[in-house]
């Protein structure tokens, strides 16, 4: 009888955790409250900043550019969400953009809006439009709860049939932070997240839209990924690509969604 009740509770918990994303339309399995996830993200982000060199935007053109592009992407996101009457989903986001001195060709966005770009990415992004498409991609991972999905899948796999009791018992312990660390990476691996294929393609599609709404040509997304893939053929492939889908599939999907993104594109003057 107890086993049957536990089974019912587990099924109920899973049902509650399943929701449909109001933008992508995809069903998602997310166990964690967004506010709790954002708190963990802030703690990890602050720890990261204390152990890495932040490039000041007060006297560095690259840092100024990263901040400028980041703000335009964030403004585009807010405009899109307002247009679709779902701006309330952005409550709790505290956006912040930092450029980190590192040879890694990487970028990421934490749940809650903490965006980091590494200086090693800039030679590949080459221009503001290329950077905007990278940042739009990473922001999409945060907006669509991809880290929450990764953590929820990890929790389900780790605890199996006792998912409800074990999850509730460990959500405030160090075990939960370990799961968070496994989902987002820690230390030098922060931001190297093994998102699934659907998650990556979602981020590509909407990253182009955010970039277009911010005034950057979404066509540059295709040019960017071609440069990324060319670099990946060398001895030091970008960390950014370490968990991403194959180049042919990615370019094919970018080309498929380019007309959609172009509908949002209004070029800026004097970029």
Where are these regions (language model features)?
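A Zn2+-metalloprotease active-site environment signal
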Residues: 18-271
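Sec-dependent bacterial lipoprotein signal peptides
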Residues: 1-18
């Amino acid at each position: 009888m107890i086993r049957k009740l536990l089974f019912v509770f587990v099924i109920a918990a899973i049902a509650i955790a399943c929701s449909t994303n109001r933008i992508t339309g995809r069903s998602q399995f997310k166990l964690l409250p967004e506010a709790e996830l954002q708190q963990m993200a802030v703690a990890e982000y602050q720890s990261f900043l204390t152990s890495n060199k932040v490039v000041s935007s007060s006297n560095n053109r690259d840092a100024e550019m990263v901040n400028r592009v980041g703000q335009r992407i964030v403004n585009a996101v807010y405009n899109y969400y307002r247009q679709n009457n779902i701006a309330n989903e952005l409550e709790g986001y505290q956006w912040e953009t930092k450029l980190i001195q590192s040879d890694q060709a990487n970028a990421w966005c934490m749940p809650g809006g903490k965006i980091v770009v590494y200086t090693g990415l800039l030679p590949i992004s080459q221009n503001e439009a290329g950077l905007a498409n990278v940042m739009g991609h990473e922001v999409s991972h945060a907006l669509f709860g991809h880290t929450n999905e990764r953590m929820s899948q990890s929790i389900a796999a780790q605890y199996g049939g006792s998912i409800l009791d074990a999850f509730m018992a460990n959500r405030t312990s160090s075990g939960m932070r370990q799961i968070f660390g496994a989902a987002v990476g820690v230390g030098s691996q922060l931001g190297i997240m093994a998102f699934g294929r659907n998650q990556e393609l979602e981020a590509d599609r909407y990253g182009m839209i955010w970039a277009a709404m911010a005034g950057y040509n979404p066509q540059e997304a295709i040019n960017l990924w071609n440069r990324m893939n060319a670099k990946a053929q060398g001895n030091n492939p970008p960390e950014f690509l370490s968990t991403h889908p194959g180049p042919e599939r990615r370019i094919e999907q970018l080309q498929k969604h380019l007309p959609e993104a172009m509908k949002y594109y209004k070029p800026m003057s004097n970029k």
